[in-house]
């Protein structure tokens, strides 16, 4: 029986989030919030999106997703203004443009990305 697309999306979300939270950690496993700068263990932060996860064209774009503390990402709605400032005008504008482009995701593409990020996470752990 073929795997459902929703299952693949959830699996990619999980491994991509791990990768984003791990890639900028220091030797002790701590990372700074992209928007407020507070330092936390990578397991205690979120993978915060500048452009919403609902926009598949940028959902798994590494430039669009950064480590954010739960306060900034959850309680403060992602701190979009500060997120944009920290990204810089050119990159923020590019991500807004990209997020409005159509995204045609195939199961093969999702499986390829899952495999890629699983390998990247394995290297970082």
What residue ranges belong to the model's regions?
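Short metal-coordination and nucleic-acid-contact micro-motifs, chiefly zinc-binding Cys/His arrays
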Residues: 13, 23-32, 61-65
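Histidine-centered nuclease catalytic patch
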Residues: 32-64
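Short Cys/His-centered divalent metal-binding micro-motifs
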Residues: 37-41, 65-90
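A boundary/linker detector
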Residues: 1-19, 24, 39, 96-125
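Short microdomains enriched in Cys/His and/or Lys/Arg
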Residues: 53-67, 88-100
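Secondary-structure junction/capping motif
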Residues: 3-7, 33, 52, 69
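Conserved aromatic-histidine-acidic binding/catalytic patches
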Residues: 4, 8, 57, 75
